[in-house]
Regions:
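Substrate/ligand-engaging "lid" and interaction regions
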Residues: 1-27, 31-487
C-alpha cells in the first residue's frame, strides 16, 4: 500500500455502529458520490467527529452495487488528479453497506425507522427528477403509484415517499432530504416530486392531511450547490493502478450505459454549500469544508455556478468539442478560438449578470475554472460527457442570464447585443445534426430527448438551408427553452 492513503479508523466498528444506528443514507451510487460525499464521511471518521459512515442505495443502475461495492467489500479507491501531475490515491471505507432499491425495501424500511437517521442525500443526475414527459403526462410508473397509493410502489419517488410515510407513522423525527445534484433548484425539484406523489395520495384517501403535512412541511428539502468535476474512469489511471497490483482495474460500461470502475478519478477543487434546514441534526460537515448557510446564499452560489461561472462553458465546450473532433476538455483549452469563445461568453456576457453569494468570489471561481480546472491535462474530462442531456440543461444554464438582459434597463445590457450565448445555442442546434465539421457522422451523447428535438427541427442535414420557421417548433418549445425564444 505504499503511496496509498488508508483509513485511519476501525472499519469494523464503524460498520457495526452504522448498521445499528444509521445517520446518513444516500441514493445514487455513481462516481460523484464515491468521489465527494463518501470522502467527506471519511474525513469525519478520521477526525473523530463521527462514528458512523454512509449507507448507499441505487435504484437506477443496480449493477453498480454488485461491481463497485459488494465485489470490493465496500472499499473504494479515490484518485485525485492535480494540475501539476501529482496523483493522490486514497482508500475510502466510509460506505458501510450498499442496497438495491428493487430488492432491499425491508432493509430500507429499517433504516428509515431508525431514530438516529438525520439526513438522506441524493445524486440522481438532473434527469432523475423528471416525473412528467413533454406533454406534462406523468411517467407510467409514477402514474401507477399516484393512483394506487403507498403499497407496492414502482417508481423511485413512490418508494421514497412511502418510506418517509413509514417514519411519519412511527412517530419519529422528520428528516432532511438533501439533493446533491449539479442542477439549479435541486432541493425544489426533489420536493416537487415528493409533493406530487403525496398530494395524489392525500386526495385519493391513502394518507391523512396530517401525514401530508409531515411529508412536505416537517421533512425539509434543503437547496445545495455542489461542484467537483468527476469524469469517467480514465484508462491511463487504470494502467497505473494495475501496475501497483490493483485487480480488475479496467473501467467498464454497465448495461444502463454508466461508465464505472473499482476506482473513481476526480479533480482536487470542490465546493459544497447546503441550506441550513436539518430538523433532526446533521453530520458535522461544516468541520470538513462544507458551508452550511442561509437559503438565499445557496441560491446565489448555485446561480453563480450554473448560470455564469461554469456550466454554460461546459455546454459550449461540450457541443463544439464534439463537432470539432475533440475527446478531451484539456485539449480544447489549447484551441484559441474555443478559449476565446468561453472567455468572452463568461466575462463579457454572463459576469455582468452574476449573482454574488458573498461566500465565494465569482471572479476567483471563474479564474480557477478557466485557468486551472479546464486546462488540467491529467483530468481526462471529455466534451462527450459534458454534452450529455443538453436538452435538459439549456434553459437553466442560459435562461437566468437571458432573463436578466431582457429585464435590464441599461442600454448596454440589451439581449439583442448578445453574441456568444446565441452562438452556443446555435451550436447546439448544429450539434444535433450529428455530423462533425469534416462532414463525418459522430455519435450524439446520451440524451432522452434527442429524437424528439431532432424531429422538432425537421431533421435537417449538414448544408441544408434552414429557415427560422423550421426551427420555431423547437425554439418555442417551453419544455426545452422555457421562455428563451422571442420573435
Amino acid at each position: 500500500w505504499k503511496g496509498y492513503r488508508l483509513p485511519q479508523y476501525d472499519i469494523d466498528a464503524v460498520r457495526e455502529n452504522t448498521h445499528k444506528a444509521p445517520t446518513w443514507l444516500h441514493f445514487g451510487a455513481g462516481n460523484l458520490f464515491r468521489a465527494f460525499p463518501a470522502v467527506l464521511a471519511q474525513r469525519l471518521l478520521t477526525a473523530g467527529l463521527s462514528d458512523t459512515g454512509i449507507i448507499c442505495c441505487d435504484g437506477y443502475d443496480e449493477e453498480l452495487i454488485d461491481r463497485c461495492y459488494r465485489a470490493c467489500d465496500h472499499l473504494s479507491l479515490v484518485v485525485t488528479l492535480y494540475s501539476n501531475g501529482t496523483i493522490n490515491k486514497e482508500v475510502v471505507a466510509s460506505v458501510t453497506e450498499s442496497l438495491k432499491l428493487s430488492e432491499d425495501m425491508l432493509r430500507l424500511t429499517d433504516i428509515f425507522l431508525a431514530p438516529s437517521l438525520q439526513m438522506i442525500s441524493f445524486t440522481l443526475t438532473e434527469k432523475g427528477y423528471i416525473i412528467q414527459d413533454d406533454t406534462r403526462e406523468f411517467l407510467p410508473d409514477y402514474k401507477h403509484d399516484r393512483e394506487n397509493g403507498p403499497e407496492g410502489c414502482q417508481s423511485f419517488f413512490g418508494k421514497l415517499t412511502a418510506l418517509c410515510l413509514e417514519r411519519c407513522r412511527a412517530g419519529l423525527s422528520p428528516l432532511a432530504l438533501v439533493s446533491l445534484d449539479n442542477c439549479s433548484d435541486n432541493g425544489t425539484r426533489l420536493e416537487r416530486a415528493v409533493r406530487h406523489m403525496a398530494r395524489a395520495w392525500q386526495r385519493g384517501g391513502f394518507i391523512t392531511e396530517d401525514e401530508y403535512y409531515f411529508l412536505l412541511k416537517k421533512n425539509t428539502f434543503p437547496l445545495s450547490m455542489i461542484d467537483k468535476i468527476t469524469p469517467h474512469p480514465d484508462n491511463r489511471i487504470a494502467d497505473k493502478l494495475a501496475a501497483d497490483g490493483l485487480e480488475n482495474a479496467k473501467p467498464f460500461v454497465t448495461e444502463k450505459g454508466t461508465h464505472a470502475a473499482v476506482y473513481v478519478n476526480s479533480e482536487s477543487p470542490h465546493y459544497l454549500l447546503i441550506e441550513n434546514a436539518f430538523p433532526n441534526g446533521h453530520p458535522a460537515l461544516e468541520q470538513c469544508g462544507v458551508i452550511i448557510t442561509r437559503r438565499d446564499i445557496v441560491e446565489k452560489s448555485a446561480m453563480m455556478k450554473v448560470s455564469t461561472c461554469m456550466n454554460p462553458m461546459d455546454t459550449a465546450l461540450g457541443v463544439f468539442g464534439c463537432m470539432l473532433g475533440y475527446t478531451r476538455i484539456s485539449d480544447e483549452m489549447k484551441d484559441a478560438e474555443l478559449v476565446n469563445l468561453i472567455t468572452r461568453l463568461s466575462e463579457q456576457e454572463a459576469m455582468p449578470m452574476v449573482a454574488d453569494p458573498g461566500v465565494i468570489d465569482p471572479e476567483a471561481f471563474l479564474h480557477e475554472v478557466l485557468g486551472e480546472r479546464y486546462p488540467n491535462p491529467f483530468l481526462q474530462d471529455s466534451p462527450q460527457r459534458t454534452a450529455t442531456d443538453t436538452s435538459r440543461k439549456i434553459a437553466p444554464r442560459f435562461g437566468t442570464t437571458l432573463y436578466a438582459y431582457y429585464n435590464s434597463m441599461l442600454p448596454a445590457h440589451r439581449a439583442t447585443k448578445l453574441i456568444y450565448i446565441p452562438l452556443v445555442l446555435a451550436g447546439w442546434l448544429r450539434y444535433l445534426e450529428g455530423v462533425d465539421d469534416n462532414g463525418s457522422e459522430f455519435t450524439l451523447s446520451p440524451d432522452p430527448n434527442i429524437e424528439h428535438v431532432r424531429a422538432l427541427m425537421g431533421n435537417p442535414k449538414l448544408g441544408d438551408d434552414v429557415s427560422e420557421a423550421q426551427l420555431y417548433p423547437l425554439l418555442a418549445n417551453r419544455y426545452y427553452f422555457c421562455l428563451l425564444y422571442t420573435s
